[in-house]
């Protein structure tokens, strides 16, 4: 039961916006007895399981307590996808804003019953895979690190510019630069040499700061 609640909440998502729905889900569909392992995949996150074994197996393995209630299953999956988007948003705002908009469209279609449930599951599974991977399927192969991909997505998909900035940052960054103003200014100065725009420097710097590879 605890595990089902954790999956439904997306682990770290602030559920204030969903409290009424989640309370109904918990009160109606989850018994208050001791939890027990459901499958060998029980320690895997719901999104991991959707990507690695398919959405049908993920539902059967981790959402057994909601079996028979399609809306509850759908909302649980949606909450987990939304949670991932919120957690990763600052690392690549453009990509995750796009993913958030796609999620909103899928949710709206489900609630309006404008698509069959099987089609809904296919769409949400495809979106979950993109969110889990942190990149679109058509991303150029030269953008072979999360940092490069984030720069590409937030620079109007300018591949050459993304690679140039990636290389500039990696060749000019001082050790231990995060949180040290003088060292951060070294990187900003290097960025200005490429971008020639102070506002753009500040915007891109915030993304770079969120990327561990830099």
PLM feature spans:
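Catalytic cores and motor modules of nucleic-acid processing enzymes
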Residues: 1-214
């Amino acid at each position: 039961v605890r595990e089902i609640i954790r999956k439904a909440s997306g682990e770290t998502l602030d559920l204030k916006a969903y409290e009424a729905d989640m309370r109904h889900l918990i009160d109606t569909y989850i018994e208050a007895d001791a939890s027990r392992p459901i499958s060998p995949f029980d320690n895997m996150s719901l999104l991991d399981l959707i990507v690695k074994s398919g959405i049908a197996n993920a539902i059967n393995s981790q959402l057994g307590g909601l079996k028979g209630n399609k809306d509850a299953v759908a909302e649980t999956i949606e909450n987990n996808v939304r949670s991932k988007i919120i957690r990763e948003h600052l690392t690549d705002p453009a990509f995750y804003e796009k993913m958030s908009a796609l999620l909103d469209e899928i949710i709206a279609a489900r609630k309006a019953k404008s698509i069959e449930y099987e089609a809904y599951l296919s769409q949400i599974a495809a979106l979950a895979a993109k969110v889990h991977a942190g990149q679109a399927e058509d991303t150029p192969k030269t953008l072979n690190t999360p940092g490069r991909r984030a720069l590409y997505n937030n620079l109007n998909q300018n591949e050459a510019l993304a690679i140039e900035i990636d290389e500039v940052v990696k060749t000019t960054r001082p050790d231990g630069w995060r949180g040290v103003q003088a060292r951060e200014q070294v990187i900003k100065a290097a960025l200005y040499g490429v971008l020639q725009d102070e506002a753009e420097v500040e915007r891109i710097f915030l993304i770079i700061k969120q990327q561990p590879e830099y």
